[in-house]
Design a protein with these regions (language model features):
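Acidic, low-complexity intrinsically disordered segments
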Residues: 1-26, 129, 134-310
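Cellulosome-associated attachment modules in secreted, modular CAZymes
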Residues: 2-167, 200, 247, 309
């Protein structure tokens, strides 16, 4: 609204003017950023979930349950996250409504950190996606190197963390041009894990496959899904140029964890693909946009062969 200007019109007593836009001339305090737990990383299920819970009014250790407390919280106690959120409360008004609120600002921050962009970022809200993205990006200045110690740096040597594992069941192992295949995507983790959720990317080659229907089998803590261009090459494969992003989070700190009642094992969703002209064979891959604190991620490649019969 008002070209991005957050305030009322400006008047000299006879003429009212609404600016067409605005920029922030003063840099933010370097401590005002979304790395709430001081790991030198921005993460939905660590930083974002703690912020969302904090905006709902949760305090102390209930903020960080299943999210990890990070190096600074370990040093200074569980109330550190609460203090950081309180200190940057007004800056967390990411939709610039004049009111910092869990159901709007907290959810938008979570969606952004999971990787949602554009219309899917603001679905259900009246905010401008462009303005929300620009505002949140200001709260994410470049950080130093990842905290090297386990479990904050999940790729640290000899980390050996428990894993959130994703596997796929295929309706058929081979398809031809015009043929369809359905993927059933399943999740598992050690049954004693207290999970916060998962941000999941399924990478594919859009020159060979058209994505079809997507059915969320798991409604617990689900966020919108979105197909995005893989400009960052998250899976390390130059052949896959797009990915399907799906996300889940356990908001409540009272619950034992996401999927706990299902022993951390569940079907996440089903998705179908159709082979395009020129199809021979292809490999789809997984990567994670966010995992539960103290867990790493693994997802096996999905090889779909070629059959002239479709």
């Amino acid at each position: 609204a008002n070209g991005g200007w957050p305030g009322p019109s400006i008047s000299n007593g006879s003429i009212a003017v609404v600016p067409t836009g605005y920029t922030f001339l003063c840099p933010l305090d370097p401590d005002v950023n979304l790395d709430i737990n001081c790991t030198n990383d921005y993460d939905a299920l660590n930083d974002g979930l703690a912020i969302l819970r904090g905006l709902y009014g949760l305090m102390g250790e209930t903020l960080t349950k299943n999210t990890g407390d990070g190096p600074c919280t370990s040093q200074w106690g569980g109330q550190y996250v609460e203090t950081r959120i309180n200190n940057m409360f007004y800056e967390l008004d990411v939709d610039q409504s004049g009111d910092t609120d869990a159901m709007s600002d907290g959810v938008l921050i979570m969606r952004y950190l999971f990787g949602l962009r554009g219309a899917q970022l603001v679905t259900g809200f009246t905010s401008s996606a462009e303005e929300v993205e620009a505002y949140i990006s200001r709260l994410m200045p470049a950080l130093g190197e990842l905290t090297p110690e386990c479990p904050w740096h999940k790729d640290a040597a000899d980390c050996n963390l428990p894993q959130q594992t994703v596997t796929v069941t295929l309706s058929k192992s081979k398809i031809g041009v015009g043929g369809n295949v359905e993927l059933i995507v399943n999740h598992s983790a050690p049954d004693d894990s207290g999970l916060a959720g998962l941000g999941l990317r399924l990478h594919y080659d859009s020159s060979l496959l058209d994505i079809g229907s997507i059915e969320n089998s798991l409604q617990e803590g689900v966020y919108p899904f979105q197909v995005l261009d893989d400009t960052s090459n998250y899976d390390g494969d130059a052949n896959t140029d797009k990915y399907l992003l799906t996300s889940w989070a356990e908001l409540s700190s009272d619950a034992k964890g996401w999927l706990y009642d299902d022993f951390n094992t569940s079907t996440l969703y089903k998705v179908s693909f159709t082979a395009k002209d020129g199809y021979q064979e292809t490999t789809l891959k997984f990567s994670a946009s966010s995992t539960t604190y103290g867990h790493s991620f693994t997802g096996a490649d999905i090889n779909i062969g070629f059959s002239p019969d479709g």
